[in-house]
Every structure is written in C-alpha cells, then in structure tokens.
C-alpha cells in the first residue's frame, strides 16, 4: 500500500528533514545560507528539481532496469536542474548571479538521488511527487532558518535583497535587526554555517527526544 499523504508531509518537513536528520546537501547548506534570501532561493530551486524528478522517475520506473537506474536518475535530475538554472537566469538574474554557481551542483546533491532511490522508484506517481515536493520544502525551511540566524547575528539584517527573489513587494520583509557593526563576522562565513547547522541539528534531536519520538533515518513510507 502506498504511503499516507500525511506521513509524507510530516516526514519531509520535520521528522526526516534532509538537513537536520539525514545531514544531506551540506555543500549548499554551508555555502548558500549566508542570508535567509539565499537559503530560500537555493531551497526552492532544489524543491522544484526534487518534485519534478520524483514525478518522472515514478512515471517511468517500470521501464528502467535495475542495472542502469543510477545513470538514468542522474540524467533526469540534471535535466530538471538545467530547466531551473535557465529559468532563474532569465527571470531572477540578479539572484542568479549569487546562486548560479551552486545551482548546477544540485545534480550532485545526495538528497534528490536518495529520495529517487528510496521512494520514487517504489511508489506511485502522486505520493512520489509529494515526497519530492515536501522533502524539498523541508530542505528549504532548514536552509532559510540557518540563513536567517547567520544573517541576523552576522550582519544585523533579515531577508536582505528579498526583492530579488520574490519581487518588489518583498521589500517589506527586509529588516534591520541590529546595527551592522555589532555583527559577528564568522557567522556569515562557512565556519558559521557549520556552527549554526550543528546547533539546529542538536535542537531538533532534543525536541524529538523530549516528545518521546524514536530517532530514525528516512526510507520509503510504505505501510
């Protein structure tokens, strides 16, 4: 029986979060979370790729032999990354100049490939699409949260340059939370990413343990 949709959503957003539980996608997590806007943009790009890739693999899984599945998965992810890369270059060019170097690296991100192998290759189309979407959104939430903490403490702002990603209305989100010269510079550098990500992983574990939840790794959600 295919997975329940509620379980898919809960796993993707919290219980099996790709960053906070599985520790996957650490390259963009360290490099692209200097600000909340960068984390949000990178996360949404990854979510789009994961949703589309899961959908395609679920549709064609019966036509792909076990021996060649990994190269096929990589080609599917690469094709979707190319679409996202070209779209961001066309419609979000200023943000693309910041994120563009790392968008192609989504192909080598272990999280999309892990979900293709663990879920999309075994489950029907709609659950697979939702798994990719919500695993991607969970990844987005983690990157945005890490970016927000690093940005606020490191440079005293929140959602700086959000208008580049979300449009002119998003200037309302751009806040100055403390004077710029009060910031702790190390937090907007890669070591700060390791520090904040590690603290968030610990915080999630403590919340889960306090709630009496079993700590487990992600897999297919079949019941």
Swiss-Prot record:
Gene name for this UniProt entry:
rnfE
Assigned GO CC terms: plasma membrane
What name goes with this protein? Ion-translocating oxidoreductase complex subunit E
What is the organism lineage in this UniProt record? Bacteria, Pseudomonadati, Pseudomonadota, Alphaproteobacteria, Rhodospirillales
What does the UniProt entry say about where the protein is found?
Answer: Cell inner membrane
| Presence of the UniProt keyword Protein biosynthesis in the record | no
Keyword field contains ATP-binding: no
Q: Kind of enzyme, top EC level?
A: translocase
Pfam families named in the record: Rnf-Nqr (PF02508)
Query: What does the record give as the function of this protein?
Result: Part of a membrane-bound complex that couples electron transfer with translocation of ions across the membrane.
Assembly information from the UniProt record: The complex is composed of six subunits: RnfA, RnfB, RnfC, RnfD, RnfE and RnfG.
Q: Which UniProt key words apply to this protein?
A: Cell inner membrane, Cell membrane, Electron transport, Membrane, Translocase, Transmembrane, Transmembrane helix, Transport
Q: Which residues cross the membrane?
A: 17-37, 40-60, 70-90, 94-114, 129-149, 182-202
> EC annotation?
7.-.-.-
GO terms for biological process? Answer: electron transport chain
Superkingdom of origin: Bacteria
Give the InterPro entries listed for this entry. Answer: NqrDE/RnfAE (IPR003667), RnfE (IPR010968)
Q: How does the protein's chain sit in the membrane according to the entry?
A: Multi-pass membrane protein
Similarity comment: family membership = Belongs to the NqrDE/RnfAE family.
